[in-house]
Amino acid sequence: GVQTCALPILVAPGTNRALKPGDRVAGYTQNVFQEPCGHCEACLAGDWDHCTNRRVFTWKGGELGHPGAYSQYTTWFPHSLVKLPDNVTNEEGAMAEPFAVGLHAIQVSQVKPNDRVLILGGGIIGMSCAEWARTFGASEITVSELNPQKREIIRGYQVADHVVAADAPDLEQQLLDISGGGYDLLIDCVGVPSAFNTGLRALKPEFYMRATAVGLPHAQFPLDYERLVLKQVLLRGSKGHNFDEFKTVINAMASGRISVKKYISRRIKLEEVQAGFEAMKAARGLDTKVIIETQ
């Protein structure tokens, strides 16, 4: 429940003078139990998500123990709420977080005009990366996706130039043919070793190609270390986003720089959440983003 748009009912005195009850806001992602310290190097740079003095538990280390936006009411640090412009809808506000994750990955990757970009995974983060890569001037975007039905959905978004089957036996050769000899940048949004290593092999043979890891692996990750060294690949990790990027996304929505509503697969009520998760599991990832309406 970290991707949210809400209406404040009560704003603690002296915390955020720009907000008042009834404003429409989007909530910058954070651990609701522990406010960023405000004095570490990350906080001083405005990167609260990477505060070195916070303890954040994830799916790998335990539960957050808080419903986040999976409830009618919740709490949020007031300084982490961004008031939405009048021409940004509530649904768009709820999409700010995943598109900030994509923006962060693209900025970490240092996408340049005319880059050929390979993205592994066609979920909301992969599509966010594709949208921002295009905005930053990428000339050719290829998305690799396992699910054949999802591949057709991705083609309908018209943001990727090529959508390929992640399980194709000749995938590496396909990628080299499509890109005319290799990509400038690999962005991994799935965390699957075989896919990542294939992506490494599909980078250009020239020096200093780039690879960015966004997806978290679910097990040990054997890396094609030899290929990494021989190609002198610049490998970066990308986690979350910072507050400036979050605000940039909202401003980009308001200006029309990016369009996000096409990625909303369907809408469900709060009481339908459990059934919604089961439907997502049964559909094996056909949804890109589901909006939960809490009222």
Q: Where are these predicted regions, by residue range?
A:
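Mid-domain Rossmann-like dinucleotide-binding core that forms the NAD(H)/NADP(H) cofactor-binding site
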Residues: 79, 85-168
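Rossmann-fold dehydrogenase core element
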Residues: 210-212, 222-263
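C-terminal hydrophobic helical "lid"/dimerization subdomain
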Residues: 169, 181, 193, 197-201, ...
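Cysteine-cluster motifs in flexible loop/terminal segments that predominantly coordinate metals
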Residues: 29-79
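Single conserved hydrophobic/aromatic residue that forms the stacking wall/gate
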Residues: 1-5
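Glycine-rich cofactor phosphate-binding loops and adjacent beta1-alpha1 units
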Residues: 109, 136, 142, 148-234
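Glycine-rich beta-strand-centered segment in the early N-terminal region that forms part
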Residues: 6-44, 85-87
